[in-house]
Structure formats: C-alpha cells, structure tokens
Amino acid sequence: LILFGSVSCVDNDNIGPIEKVNFLQFDFPQGNALWDKEIEQIAKDWGMYIIYKNVDSTHLNRMWTIPYYTDPIYVCSEPSSEDIQIYLDLVQEWLLGSLDKTKEEDKKQLPYYLYLVNDLNDGNPQSQTYQKRHIQFKKDGLDYWSLSFTSEELAAGLTPEIIHSVACAFSYPSLKVRFETKEYK
C-alpha cells in the first residue's frame, strides 16, 4: 500500500510522447553494394528488413518460450557477396512478386526480419536433430524468417527442384491472405 502511494505521487508532468522507437538489432543498410539499395527499398515498401550480415545463434534462437537443453540451437554461416544476389532474386520474384505492396493485409504476412544465411542447421549436440539436416526455410522465429541454402547448393547452382521448393514456401503468405480476404473462394 505504501509503495502504491509513493508511485502514484510521482510527478509525471515531464513525460511526453515518444517520437520514434528503433527496434532494429542490426546496422541497416548492411553495406553499400547495389543489392543494399534494393534491400533498403524493400524495407521502405514492405516493412521487412533483409539481413545477411552478423546473424548468429542469438538471433536465430529468439522465441516465445524458454527452450529445453535438448531443443535445437540453430546456427548458420554468412553468405558470400555472390550469394546475396541469388537470395535476393528469389525473394523479389517468389515472395514479394506474389504480394501487393498497396495492400496492408499483404504487408502483414511478412516478418520484421528476413535472414539470408548459409548452412542453417541444428548445432546443439544434445538435440535429436543435431546436424542431421539443413533447414532451407524457417518461419517459426519470434520476429523473423530465414532462408538458407547449403554452400554446396550455391556453388553448384540452385536446381529447379530447390527453386520450386522455395517458390512453394514463399507463395503461402499471398495465398493465405487472398483466402482470408475472400479474394479467392
């Protein structure tokens, strides 16, 4: 009761509105290559920040609950400069190409962050899935999705099957919003 009284008597006259809050955990844009301008425009148009540098397990393992010691701990490697354009082309064509940036419902389907990483997998030796498989597309992050290819896939060139898999995963958000808004019946 005393605590309530002392808190309620504090002078709040100096409290004003917050002008701007920056939730970005990364430097953005992440460079000054041609694709960085494209990524910056995507952030302005869509509200989705594409991140490809300095993504580590602390970012990949943010979640709503506290994990058990046997849960996966996601790890990755940073894509090369040559890889970034491959990732970005897929994002532009298959994810953003199926959405309408003038529709707020479409923008709401996208994550705050899209991590472009190589070799995403489970790095927890206590986990049942430890280094057993590569994770191509992860959509269950707290505020992010991640798109990943293995270094070998990128070096050999993406096969039509791999591109098809990404296209199918990326088409889901646009289909979902079209059905929810009854644009598709």
Where are these regions (language model features)?
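General structural signal for secondary-structure boundaries
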Residues: 76, 80, 100-106, 155-162
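Auxiliary, metal-adjacent structural segments of Zn-dependent hydrolase domains
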Residues: 83-142
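Acidic/polar, low-complexity intrinsically disordered N-terminal segments immediately downstream
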Residues: 9-98
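Short loop/turn segments at strand-loop or loop-helix junctions that form parts
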Residues: 63-69, 117-119, 146-150
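C-terminal motif of bacterial Sec signal peptides marking the signal peptidase cleavage site
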Residues: 4-8
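Active-site recognition of the HExxH zinc-binding catalytic motif
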Residues: 143-185
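Generic structural motif recognizing short loop/turn segments at the entrances and edges of beta-strands
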Residues: 46-47, 58-62, 108-113, 140-145
